[in-house]
């Protein structure tokens, strides 16, 4: 878990800062929330800068992530120490706790953890899904046949129904509805590994275009992760596989911007 990861890096001589970043909060085309870890070896230039700052100042003013993606404090600061071996932490850390001790923003240095909630600060414009859609003719394979529309609607819709498990157990299944078709005036939902498949799905995107209702193309999925066009187009790589690859990827715009800041910090 999170504590084991931090302690492992601490044992290897790293200080760590982290932030949960939703790419769409900073003007990117996909709502994809991921934890970004930055580790600084004790002999590195950034580590020495970190040591001169306080943990709270690093997280809210001086740090690499804060100088890439601005955020403001949204909770009290929590501090604690990781000082046990990995086995003990794995077996006993926060046992019985009802919530994680780690917030969406934090750092660890010499086993001392500082963590707090933050919220994103961004004054630019969002990037809507419609801005990355292909302009030309899209292959017929991506359009949803009318015969499959009822199944798409069922899967995307709200449900409260009895189901029977493989061993005969009857249980109540319920879930809320999803927007269908997807709203192209907002950043996309998180794309997943099954995005490239053809069958009706609750989680695949479906957009209404002037030519009909269709799924997203591999090119559009690449753009949602901010890869170059046709980055995954190779002989023998199917469209389904290309969708799978993008479902496993990060929004590289986040990584690129953090990398640019790291470069500046190391000059």
Where are these regions (language model features)?
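Class I S-adenosyl-L-methionine
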Residues: 1-180
């Amino acid at each position: 878990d999170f504590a084991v990861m931090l302690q492992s890096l601490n044992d290897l001589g790293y200080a760590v800062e982290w932030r949960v970043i939703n790419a769409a909060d900073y003007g990117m085309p996909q709502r994809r929330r991921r934890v970004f870890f930055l580790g600084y070896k004790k002999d590195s230039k950034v580590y020495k800068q970190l040591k001169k700052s306080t943990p709270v100042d690093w997280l809210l003013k001086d740090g690499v992530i804060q100088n890439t993606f601005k955020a403001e404090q949204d909770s009290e600061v929590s501090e604690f120490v990781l000082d046990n071996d990995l086995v003990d932490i794995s077996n006993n850390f926060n046992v019985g706790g009802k919530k994680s001790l780690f917030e969406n923003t934090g750092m660890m240095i010499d086993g001392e953890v500082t963590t707090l909630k933050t919220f994103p600060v961004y004054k630019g414009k969002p990037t809507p899904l419609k801005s990355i859609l292909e302009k030309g003719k899209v292959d017929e394979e991506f359009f949803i046949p009318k015969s499959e529309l009822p199944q798409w609607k069922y899967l995307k819709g709200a449900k409260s129904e009895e189901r029977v498990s493989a061993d005969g157990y009857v249980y109540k299944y319920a879930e809320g509805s999803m927007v269908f078709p997807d709203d192209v005036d907002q950043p996309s939902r998180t794309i997943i590994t099954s995005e490239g498949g053809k069958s009706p799905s609750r989680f695949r995107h479906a957009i209404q275009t002037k030519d009909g209702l269709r799924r997203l193309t591999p090119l559009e999925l690449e753009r949602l992760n901010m890869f170059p066009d046709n980055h995954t187009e190779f002989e023998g790589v199917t469209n389904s596989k290309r969708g799978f690859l993008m479902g496993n990827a990060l929004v590289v715009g986040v990584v690129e911007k953090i990398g640019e800041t790291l470069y500046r910090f190391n000059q």
